[in-house]
């Protein structure tokens, strides 16, 4: 069984027991329970439920594991014949969530 949930303006495919990495959820601390009620799609034992726009009564329950930063993404701006370049780096915050159950 799997579902597609919408959070932080993006859609993610989730399964029970798997870990979901999303944009940082500032309102939750590690160990808190998080509930996604914007379920767009559910597939269970060959049965398919598609929401218009969301599936009625469906929710996904997970537990926040950690807030951390992803690997550094480096960008380089090089100017030919000027002997100059600019290097920048960015590390995006993310939240790791363990999916505990999908309820209909």
Swiss-Prot record:
It holds the Pfam family Ribosomal_L21p. InterPro entries: bL21-like, bL21-like_sf, Ribosomal_bL21, Ribosomal_bL21_CS. Disulfide bonds: none annotated. Keywords: Ribonucleoprotein, Ribosomal protein, RNA-binding, rRNA-binding. One of its GO terms (cellular component) is cytoplasm. One of its GO terms (biological process) is translation. GO terms for molecular function: rRNA binding; structural constituent of ribosome. It comes from the Bacteria. This protein binds to 23S rRNA in the presence of protein L20. Belongs to the bacterial ribosomal protein bL21 family. Part of the 50S ribosomal subunit. Contacts protein L20. This is Large ribosomal subunit protein bL21. It comes from Thermotoga sp. (strain RQ2).
């Amino acid at each position: 069984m799997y579902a597609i949930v919408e959070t932080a303006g993006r859609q993610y495919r989730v399964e029970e027991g798997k870990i979901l990495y999303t944009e940082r959820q500032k309102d939750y601390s590690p160990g808190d329970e998080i509930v996604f009620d914007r379920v767009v799609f559910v597939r269970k034992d060959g049965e398919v439920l598609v929401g218009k726009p969301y599936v009625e009564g469906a929710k996904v329950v997970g537990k926040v594991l950690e807030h951390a930063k992803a690997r550094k993404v480096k960008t380089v701006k090089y100017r030919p014949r000027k002997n100059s370049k600019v290097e920048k780096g960015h590390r995006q915050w993310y939240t790791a969530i363990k999916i505990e159950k999908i309820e209909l």
